[in-house]
A protein has these predicted regions:
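Cysteine-centered motifs
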Residues: 6-9
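Glycine-rich phosphate/diphosphate-binding loops that line cofactor/substrate pockets in enzymes
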Residues: 49-64, 88-89, 165-166, 283-292, ...
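C-terminal catalytic subdomain
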Residues: 302-397
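Short glycine-rich or small-residue beta-strand-to-loop segments that form or flank ligand, phosphate
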Residues: 62-73, 96-100, 172, 293-296
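Extended hydrophobic packing segments that form well-structured cores
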Residues: 33-34, 38, 43-47, 382-456
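Long, charge-dense
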Residues: 94-142, 349-369
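Histidine-anchored nucleotide/phosphate-binding helix
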Residues: 73-89, 308-319
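Conserved, well-structured core segments that form the ligand-binding/active-site neighborhood
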Residues: 124, 128-286, 317
Length: 456
């Protein structure tokens, strides 16, 4: 087992690998695909599709699964991971949730999401210490894809388990959905961010923020994605990764979550097809700018503004100038999932791009934590509309003073819930007894909303 990685070398030259793995994957392909804007896949359908793909892959001796964490619970990645474990048994030796910078999963969350998969095979990703660098995307390429906005080298970093574990199959499992950092979530983001390191995560987030979130959300082939794809092609092609991608959205007619697609393959095509379907079912072009948007954050999933600000990202292109976003966040207890990022958010706040870029230029601690700087940009309305957070009232919740200190308004969750009859609201447009129109969203992580004036 190698002790450390040559930081300036490609991994395939720096380590004594199982050579057969390097040449096993001669061609790329789709192993399974099923999905449309009317498809409704059951858990049994997902199991059948996964098993069909695994049969095509042939015998595998040591398998690693990389699903998302509990923040992606609706993705069905938990069930698919359990199905993979049922298929491979003891040959599925490790499960590494793609935490990125998120807090590790609790035993209760693991049981809820992954069923009977043994807790003993779960590993916890440490984005600050557990990574190796496969290679560097050159600054010239970064400058090319960002239209000159940035020109630093980008490190392709992954958890060391991927390269030291001698796996002959790595299943990267997750949901493709609009995303604020990369345009559309999943595919190789699950690898380079979900199991990535501090520098790689920081710089990828900053690329997206500086290039412009609204230029990227809902697009599959963004500058950040191009950087990831470069890394996949040049530095990670030897890793036996197969992507298992779901498309899940809220069915507006039934009011229930529906699985619209399952795509399994080992190259960009699997992601591209899933992303195309996602934009059909996860995206809504609103007929007019929204003056008031009310978003509910499920307390089992959203405990920080790091995650809860999806309510800002996913609705910003739909909200009218001078409008208001009200976020009901009963479990809100922190700003960042990571303690250092939490401290930086408290110190610098969500005060817009010019303020954040100035602070970044002047403060080394932000320069060393560019994902935090990017998040501060993403989480601001740039003064265009008001953002009101309504946390719960338990001792662990963020206080009114804490909410207001970072640039948000504070709202009383009980008063807002009563005023807008929240338990009775339906998805989308609602008209209150006094004639006020509001737009309600029960889970911002599942969609993207925009008005044509702000989405080209």
């Amino acid at each position: 087992m190698p002790e450390k990685l040559c930081q300036n070398c490609f991994y395939i030259v720096s380590f004594p690998l199982n050579v057969s793995l390097l040449f096993e994957k001669i061609s790329t392909m789709m192993y399974f695909e099923k999905g449309s804007a009317t498809t409704d896949l059951t858990p049994e359908d997902l199991k059948t599709g996964l098993y069909e793909a695994l049969e095509k892959l042939g015998n595998r001796q040591k398998v690693l699964a990389i699903p998302p964490d509990f923040t992606r619970y609706p993705s069905h990645a938990g069930e698919l991971t359990e199905f993979a474990w049922q298929y491979y048994g003891d040959q599925l030796t490790d499960v590494l949730p793609a935490l990125g910078t998120h807090t590790g999963m609790t035993d209760e969350q693991i049981t809820t999401m992954f069923g009977q998969v043994p807790k003993s095979i779960f590993r916890v990703h440490d984005w600050r210490h557990d990574v190796v660098t496969l290679g560097y995307v050159p600054g010239e390429y970064v400058a090319e894809v960002t239209e000159g906005a940035l020109s630093f080298d980008w490190p392709a970093q992954v958890n060391k388990l991927l390269v030291e574990g001698n796996f002959d199959l790595i299943l990267s499992i997750g949901q493709v959905v609009p995303h604020e950092v990369v345009g559309m979530a999943n595919y190789n983001k699950n690898i380079f961010v979900g199991t990535g390191g501090q520098e790689g995560i920081n710089k990828s987030h900053f690329i997206g923020a500086v290039y412009g979130m609204e230029r990227m959300m809902g697009r599959a082939n963004t500058p950040v994605r191009k950087v990831f794809n470069y890394a996949s092609e040049h530095f990670a092609a030897h890793l036996p990764i197969v992507y298992v991608q779901t498309v899940v959205a809220l069915n507006k007619e039934t009011g229930k979550l529906q699985t619209y697609g399952l795509f399994i393959g080992d190259d960009f095509e699997v992601f591209d097809k899933a992303a195309g379907l996602s934009m059909q079912v996860n995206f809504e072009m609103v007929e007019k700018p929204l003056k008031k948007v009310l978003v509910w954050l499920d307390p089992s999933e959203f405990k920080s503004t790091w995650l809860g600000n999806k309510s800002v990202y996913r609705t910003r292109m739909a909200i009218a100038d001078g409008g208001e976003l009200i976020v009901l966040a009963p479990a809100l207890r922190e700003f960042g999932e990571d303690k250092e990022i939490d401290r930086l958010i408290r110190k610098y706040g969500y005060f817009g791009t010019p303020h954040t870029l100035k602070a970044t230029n002047e403060n080394e601690e932000l320069q060393q934590n560019l994902s935090a700087a990017a998040h501060l940009i993403h989480g601001s309305s740039e003064g265009r509309f008001a953002i009101t957070y309504c946390p719960g009232k338990n001792p662990e919740n963020l206080t009114k003073e804490e909410i207001e200190s970072v640039g948000f308004r504070w709202g009383d969750i009980d008063e807002i819930t009563e005023k807008y009859h929240v338990p009775t609201l339906k998805e989308g447009w609602n008209v209150m007894p006094d004639g006020e129109e509001i737009f309600y969203i029960s889970n911002p992580a599942l969609g993207l909303w925009a008005h044509k004036d702000r989405f080209n």
